[in-house]
Amino acid sequence: MSDMHSLLIAAILGVVEGLTEFLPVSSTGHMIIVGHLLGFEGDTAKTFEVVIQLGSILAVVVMFWRRLFGLIGIHFGRPLQHEGESKGRLTLIHILLGMIPAVVLGLLFHDTIKSLFNPINVMYALVVGGLLLIAAECLKPKEPRAPGLDDMTYRQAFMIGCFQCLALWPGFSRSGATISGGMLMGVSRYAASEFSFLLAVPMMMGATALDLYKSWGFLTTGDIPMFAVGFITAFVVALIAIKTFLQLIKRISFIPFAIYRFIVAAAVYVVFF
């Protein structure tokens, strides 16, 4: 593979990662399809995907840096409030409660989960995740019990964490699982999305660090330019995607995302079967 060709592939996959990582559409499903079409598969490809996820994580840190510092007791200016008056304040305990279920299951069944990374499982996960998004829109309370991020209870945070376990199924979408769970628990669409992004930072950093440790042997110095392009592209595109997504969900429901998931599932079937 020539240098220019590999850099082009890195840029394309960086765009795909940045666009889909935090949308409820499954970045895994998209990366599998695009990687297959580009002929970029195997151990190096898997390591590359792990590295560029760090770019997406960095985008969340940049977007929510004030809120993240606030979780550890460092505040800049007035406390942040979004989408409704605050009755309390989101704390690090909320994040920890949202992490525990998936962390426990992820550590216990890490190898089993990795064995599920194949097109057929991803295809089914895309469909089931789409159905969950539709269920969340149809069954959510008419008036959210937690209109703002700071209105969330510990119970809601923990239940969102339980829904996050669904994302251990490759192709399900971590953001889709957590946002749907939040809405079903009475958290507003916007606040559930914000919490999903905040929860992504420790969850994805932990999972990425573990995957990177296990994949370290596949890295070579020759891969650095390609990985750097993918990382930077994913970071920039994820920044734009997050900003756009948070504005978009104020105006539309998640039904279009569910329909899109069904289309991607059909694409997986066409490409691989």
Swiss-Prot record:
Record GO cellular component, one term = plasma membrane
* Top EC class for this record: hydrolase
Which BP terms from GO are recorded?
cell wall organization; peptidoglycan biosynthetic process; regulation of cell shape; response to antibiotic
Q: Where is the signal peptide?
A: none
Q: Which reaction does it catalyse?
A: di-trans,octa-cis-undecaprenyl diphosphate + H2O = di-trans,octa-cis-undecaprenyl phosphate + phosphate + H(+)
Q: What InterPro entries does UniProt report for this protein, alphabetically?
A: UppP
Q: Name one Pfam family in it.
A: BacA
**Keywords, sorted A to Z:** Antibiotic resistance, Cell inner membrane, Cell membrane, Cell shape, Cell wall biogenesis/degradation, Hydrolase, Membrane, Peptidoglycan synthesis, Transmembrane, Transmembrane helix
Q: Does the keyword Transmembrane helix apply?
A: yes
Has the keyword Cell wall biogenesis/degradation been applied to this entry?
A: yes
Disulfide-bond pairs as recorded: none
A single GO molecular function term of this UniProt record: undecaprenyl-diphosphatase activity
Function (record text): Catalyzes the dephosphorylation of undecaprenyl diphosphate (UPP). Confers resistance to bacitracin.
What more does the record tell us?
Bacitracin is thought to be involved in the inhibition of peptidoglycan synthesis by sequestering undecaprenyl diphosphate, thereby reducing the pool of lipid carrier available.
Protein name from the UniProt record: Undecaprenyl-diphosphatase
Q: Which organism is it from?
A: Escherichia coli O1:K1 / APEC
